[in-house]
Amino acid sequence: DKDTYKVSGGLHGVGVSCVNALSSLLVATVHREGKVFQQKYSTGNPQGAVEVVGQSDRTGTTIYFEPDATIFATTEYKYETVSKRLRELSYLNKGIRLTLTDLRETDEQGRHLYEEFFSEGGLKEFVEHLDSTRQPLLPAPIHVEKTDGDIPVEVALIYNNSYSENVFSYVNNINTHEGGTHVSGFRRALTRTLKSYADKSGMLEKAKVEITGDDFREGLTAVISIKVAEPQFEGQTKTKLGNSDAIGAVDNAVSEILGYYLEENPREAKLIIQKVILAAQARQAARKAREMVQRKNVMGGTSLPGKLADCSDTNPERCELYLVEGDSAGGSAKQGRDRSFQAILPLRGKILNVEKAQEYKIYDNEEIKNMITAMGVTFGTEEDSKALNLTKLRYHKIIIMTDADVDGSHIRTLILTFFFRYMRELIEQGYLYVALPPLYIVKKGKEERYAWSDAERDAIIREIAPEGKEDSVGIQRY
């Protein structure tokens, strides 16, 4: 309804009507014209007429609601979720002050948990917040703010010393996780404008390297926010924008202001283009490294890593691969496995932290090469030369099995990071698992029991040892 709201989340959103229908009690209180008006509802039905309940010298609306416990299994709100969303909204709507108070608990001084969210810089501050743990390449974010036709466009972007792309997009304050036409417009403008500048500067010709769109986005953090009167989303969840006019609006705004920025800031422009050239060189090196890993696999036939204790079954649906921490753990894992369907691959030490390494170095890493070879995966499909190809995947269960200590947690995190960044399809298709190691083994005589917590350990001791004979129980901490 454009007469009521200039922009909104569009149809089918979880607005006040939906919240009202799903609440056992909703109270709407409105301050206007010197009075306080109030109406109560239950499961969407008015419990009486609108009443005047007092006088007021201000304006505003308060909504109080209690979720219906007959509909929701859980009616408890997570403070962190609400806090994160309000912080996000404060950046997207600069100059607006939002407050969050949790009345459920108090601290030692009897105070309720309270936060205030306010952003004067808007998306520029948002980008700095997102990049707070990275080293920036530019002294300040590049800021785009322009209305193209009927579409207000705001973008903030900055480059950092990482190798990943982080682009966050919003339409009418809704987070469009899957992107859409506004992100397409941004990428088109970024690639074209930077390519044009790089060509004119002569830096590309000097470097003798071929650039692709991905190279312009390595180490980029950006937030895109547009306002559209009638948003068209693909799917009910509103995670992808479909409005075709958003492409041109974002493209025009970003092209114009980014072009000015590059001309007026030649030092920063040179840093960006140097970063792009390095990304292109690293991409070509990574492609060669990937091809080398795959060529060895092909030329070697069924040559598998020497440390792999493979299983006898060849049906991937029945086979499991355990990635274990070191040779000693690999030895005990081999002793305890069922060799018909369980394979063991010991990994030596901590694998490479792929979050901080260039891609070509990843495929040179011995442990990562062993994992790729053992799993049988390749890179490259008809649609995408970098995409993971799972047609020859040898195991449908890949289990990360590390120790229950700090080192084990670190190794597990490094392995998960590799899979998330370079083999996400394995996670999405449900092939990746994490083993939950016990913390203790409790022994008494020939009896051995495992415990996954201190409480479970104590319960086992009470169960197997008479009172006063606890010393007869042996406990080993893993």
Swiss-Prot record:
Residues engaged in binding Mg(2+) 1: 325, 403
Residues in Toprim domain copies: 319-438
Gene Ontology biological process terms, A to Z: DNA topological change
Gene Ontology molecular functions: ATP binding; DNA binding; DNA topoisomerase type II (double strand cut, ATP-hydrolyzing) activity; metal ion binding
Cofactor(s) the protein requires to work: Mg(2+); Mn(2+); Ca(2+)
Enzyme class: isomerase
Family: Belongs to the type II topoisomerase GyrB family.
Note: Few gyrases are as efficient as E.coli at forming negative supercoils. Not all organisms have 2 type II topoisomerases; in organisms with a single type II topoisomerase this enzyme also has to decatenate newly replicated chromosomes.
Protein name: DNA gyrase subunit B
Organism field: Eisenibacter elegans
